[in-house]
């Protein structure tokens, strides 16, 4: 009885691993806090640019969430700390017809995230992971974490959040990966979502 009531924790097609594997499209860009800027742009009333001290002054949160990469590994219970995405949405007054957030990163990576997933209470811009300052290869100084989607949407080395009413596909989305990427629906690829095409993301 108890067993049948257990909530399934691992999304379909995934396997547990102990540590997240570092996945990067290129070399890890250096994190220089003195010239760090976070830009919030697009369809907003008040576009802003924040330096590192302004980022640090924002309200903070922490979450513990599983992390699912589309290449089929999942890591249990990573603790992320940082700024809730909702704070940033309020700060710039995002227009009501915004549907997507295009995230741009210092390594040239980008990803587009549906606004409902981006705005969830467990989504954040993290500067700490499992109790320590984010390691360079995990996205320092600041990475997006959207735990309800595959990990390719959790962009590292974030520089800009552009709020859009019309979708603009990011790096992996231009290469056939799913617009949304919900691991529970196995939204891996746009065509043939559960396909066996070799996963790069
Ligand atoms: N800027 C940037 N962010 C990125 C990537 C990348 O190549 N560049 N790779 C993505 C992919 S495919 C995954 S699985 C996760 C991996 O996070 P990790 O390297 O911290 O384990 O980062 C995502 N964010
Ligand atoms: Mo990934």
Regions found by a protein language model. Name each.
Residues 2-201:
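Structured, non-membrane catalytic/scaffold regions adjacent to prosthetic-group chemistry
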